[in-house]
């Protein structure tokens, strides 16, 4: 029984090219040649994005584009994709240098996320670029988890996490939050918070600092998404 056979059984897909699945789990510290997951991860990033958006559009045909974009931000985040990888014990299959293994890097959310994306790219390529098959397998394993997250209150409200995931992934920077005013009586205060990122600034108001930050982050997310759309 080869090292990936148990995973293949769990997924319900048998790789024709065993080197391809091995490559999907090979960290650059283990192999600095082209035999690591970096290129597969590049393809897998777009593939997982597409399959996730497809689930959202089919499940919520009446949601506005802005709402779907914000939901997608959570569902393709490093943290969430790493949790999907952990649900299939991906950390057990990662090929990594001894030094990185001692540091526990095989459980690092960033690496788990990369491997998760690379794995789906590997299936897509190995199947002869069969998008229908790849999408069917992905939905079989993760559609219920994705929809469960969409319906959870924590996902709907945590715009700060979504914003930080996007800014760190694309620009390697974090937004900054400042309280700019607190008004009203002690029992009914209104907080105004600004969110700063690069040359952008948004504000949010709420009856707590936390809520005001979420509103400011939500507004910043919308601006960034609008700006990205203008570039395409």
From Swiss-Prot:
The protein's assembly and partners: Homodimer.
Q: Name one GO cellular component term.
A: cytoplasm
* Molecular function terms from GO: metal ion binding; ribonuclease III activity; rRNA binding
Q: What cofactor does this protein call for?
A: Mg(2+)
Cellular compartments annotated: Cytoplasm
- Matching Pfam families, A to Z? dsrm, Ribonucleas_3_3
**Domain of life of the native organism:** Bacteria
List the GO biological process terms.
mRNA processing; rRNA processing; tRNA processing
The UniProt similarity line reads: Belongs to the ribonuclease III family.
Residues in DRBM domain copies:
158-226
**Per the annotation, which location comes first and is thus the protein's main one?**
cytoplasm
Q: Which InterPro entries has this protein been placed in? A: dsRBD_dom, RNase_III, RNase_III_dom, RNase_III_sf
Active site, UniProt feature: 45, 117
Question: Domain RNase III: where?
Answer: 4-128
Keyword set includes ATP-binding = no
Functionally, this protein is described as follows: Digests double-stranded RNA. Involved in the processing of primary rRNA transcript to yield the immediate precursors to the large and small rRNAs (23S and 16S). Processes some mRNAs, and tRNAs when they are encoded in the rRNA operon. Processes pre-crRNA and tracrRNA of type II CRISPR loci if present in the organism.
Record's keyword terms, sorted? Cytoplasm, Endonuclease, Hydrolase, Magnesium, Metal-binding, mRNA processing, Nuclease, RNA-binding, rRNA processing, rRNA-binding, tRNA processing
EC number(s): the record gives: 3.1.26.3
Reactions the enzyme catalyzes: Endonucleolytic cleavage to 5'-phosphomonoester
Name this protein carries in UniProt:
Ribonuclease 3
Q: Which gene encodes it?
A: rnc
